[in-house]
From Swiss-Prot:
This is Protein kinase STUNTED. GO terms for biological process: gibberellic acid mediated signaling pathway; gibberellin mediated signaling pathway; positive regulation of cell division; response to gibberellin. It comes from Arabidopsis thaliana (Mouse-ear cress). The modification Phosphoserine is found at S403. It comes from the Eukaryota. The lineage of its organism: Eukaryota, Viridiplantae, Streptophyta, Embryophyta, Tracheophyta.
Length: 617
């Protein structure tokens, strides 16, 4: 078979970079079976460093590709080979990918290490976002920068692992991304779809504000933050040209997901429970949803969330959240107790918490005893352990925070609000997400800076909640001295100097278990390890909190670790600048409640982050 260079037009080109050995066979076979489709053209590239080696390798490549000719003929795939001379494999692959305008570039890695991923990440940096970059190790995707937007719903429906479907881009691409953002305020949510504006102030891109649609809505939101957990962000999915779908498709997904829900509420029952959805019972309002409190005939309190699908993204949001929550069953996770579909209204029904949220309780008049705080910490940890390790499909919550932890009369915690959650992966360490969502003050550095998502982002946020339980402080406070608005930044120097007791909530001084206190501080410190690779998983943290692990082991780990970075790079940052920008337009302490945020990939993404100077082991 000829190996001359042939430029093929009007076809999808898959460029496969291989060595001529067994590992190359594995990569080529995977690309032909998993990536190439009917009518595509697969161009196999082998790079040699000398002309002599290139000349010698041409006949070898012909023999190498021969076994796949029949397979490609059956699938109507055109297979071509190139042996090229170059000083850099990366440089040659990038040049050829641009020349062919390749749809995908597939490379193999011999071991999962930073060095092995260098070529894949280099391609992701140099090639346009329209090119799909995949790195394969033993038949598994170990790195991917996708060329299309993949909704979480599609991840659930597909039979392929979510890690293979997740899209994103390389670390440095994300860090260098520039653009402008439009801010939309609704309730306590902040949505930042990308639009073009001028004179964007450099620095922290996620500006927080207390400005709401009307003063009345603002007052309601503050007053009833107990049910804020049930509120969704106004726009879960940023506008994107590839996101449009036919209404029939959305209807089908609704039916597929909702058919397994055990309890369907009639609209009349919910109408009666909420006094005809009266304004007096309106306890929250989002961009396209409203939440009402109500009481069923048996006296059970419920939070009724009505989603008005004025846009198709709202339907997807509803399906996605319901599909995840309905699959969960754990005593420390707030359950979805039913749904209702009434004409264009999509309604979900949740329990109405009697004690409110952990955030409310910590900031309220009731003082949580130490035993109650430890109980809440362990219960929340068990909920995360269930999501990460016990579900058939792992779940990453992505918005763990004190306002999303509901408390029963016995102070048993329940994790709630799965509107930002996503399906995790058992095969990949992390996925890259185009959109960073979550709450300022709880975002893990690798997620905020590079969009890297794994169960470790929940572990980091759990560490912030532990600090809240220890100190009684909020994750972000405008009343704190400049540079200490972040709870993590406030706690860091005290822990580093060995003055952990200064963290303790003065309301419980003298009434706490000192041994348990030090274990919780140690757990929080390890949860807040800057590099995700060295951050423990939630199961390990739980053992420490329960007293099942020897504390001396954890102290030794803390002393031995050298703040490893793996392939995560956190540049030095001007923390004060970032925090001052984050506090723009904050008018009073009430308005500094934790706002969930979203950002599309085109938004301004500063190359520095205050997270990079947060607690580390």
């Amino acid at each position: 078979m000829a190996v001359d260079k042939v430029i093929v037009k009007q076809r999808n080109i898959i460029l496969v970079g291989i060595p001529i050995d067994e590992s190359g066979v594995e990569v080529l076979k995977w690309a032909l079976e998993e990536v190439a489709k009917h009518g595509d053209c697969v161009v196999v590239v082998h790079v040699c460093f000398t002309y002599y080696r290139a000349l010698k390798s041409k006949s070898s490549l012909d023999r190498y590709l021969k076994p796949y000719i029949e397979f490609c003929s059956t699938k109507k795939i055109e297979l071509k080979g190139e042996v090229l001379k170059g000083n850099s494999v990366l440089g040659v692959l990038v040049k050829e990918a641009k020349r062919y305008n390749a749809m995908s570039v597939v490379v193999g890695v011999k071991q999962q290490s930073k060095l092995s991923l260098k070529i894949a990440k280099g391609c992701a940096k140099e090639l346009p976002s329209t090119t799909d970059i995949l790195a394969i190790h033993r038949g598994n995707i170990v790195f991917r920068r996708s060329n299309h937007y993949q909704l979480p719903l599609a991840q659930k429906i597909s039979s392929r692992p979510s890690s293979e479907l997740s899209e994103g881009f390389s670390d440095k691409d994300l860090a260098k991304t520039t653009g402008q953002e439009k801010r939309k305020i609704s309730g306590r949510s902040l949505s930042l779809p990308s639009v073009e504006v001028v004179d964007q102030t450099p620095g922290w891109p996620l500006l927080r504000t207390s400005t709401l649609a009307t003063p009345m809505v603002q007052h309601q939101t503050r007053k009833i933050s107990v049910v804020n957990w049930v509120m969704s962000l106004p726009e879960r999915f940023p506008h994107h040209p590839n996101q449009t779908c036919q209404q029939s498709f959305c209807d089908k997904q609704l039916k597929d997901i909702l058919k397994d829900i055990n309890r369907w509420f009639s609209y009349d029952v919910l109408k009666t429970a909420t006094s005809d959805f009266s304004l007096e019972n309106l306890i929250g309002k989002g961009g396209c949803n409203e939440v009402y409190k109500g009481f069923l005939e048996d006296g059970k309190g419920v939070a009724v969330k009505i989603l008005k699908p004025s846009v198709k993204e709202a339907v997807k949001e509803f399906v996605h959240e319901v599909s995840i929550v309905s699959s969960l069953s754990h005593s420390n996770i707030s359950p979805l107790i039913g749904v209702c579909v009434h004409y264009n209204d999509l309604i979900s029904v949740y329990n109405l918490s009697s004690k409110g949220s952990l955030e409310e309780t910590l900031q309220g008049k009731h003082v949580l005893r130490w035993e109650e705080r430890l109980k809440i910490a362990i219960g929340l940890g068990e909920a995360l352990d269930y999501l990460h390790n016990q579900c058939s499909n792992p779940v990453i919550h992505r918005d763990v925070k004190s306002s999303n932890v509901l408390l029963s009369d016995e102070f048993e915690p329940q994790l709630s609000d799965f509107g930002l959650s996503m399906w995790g992966s058992k095969s990949c360490r992390y996925t890259i997400q185009r959109d960073v969502v979550g709450t300022f003050g709880y975002l893990a550095p690798e997620y905020f800076m590079y969009g890297k998502v794994s169960d470790k982002v929940d572990v980091y946020a759990f560490g912030v909640v532990l600090l809240e339980l220890i100190s009684g402080r909020t994750s972000i406070s405008s009343d704190s001295p400049r540079g200490q608005e972040s709870l993590v930044m406030w706690a860091k120097p005290m822990i580093e100097k060995g003055n952990a007791k200064e963290l303790l909530d003065p309301n419980i001084a003298g009434t706490f278990d000192e041994d348990q206190f030090h274990k919780m501080v140690l757990a929080a410190t390890h949860c807040l390890t800057r590099a995700a690779t060295y951050r423990p998983n939630i199961k390990e943290i739980l053992k420490l909190l329960r007293g099942e692990d020897d504390v001396s082991k954890w102290v030794k780990i803390e002393e031995d670790d050298e703040d490893g970075f793996d392939d995560e790079v956190y540049p030095n940052s001007n923390t004060e600048l970032h925090l001052s920008l984050a506090m723009v337009d904050v008018e009073d302490n009430d308005s500094v409640s934790n706002s969930s945020l979203e950002r599309s990939n085109n938004s301004l993404f500063s190359s520095s982050s205050s997270s990079s100077q947060e607690l580390q082991s």
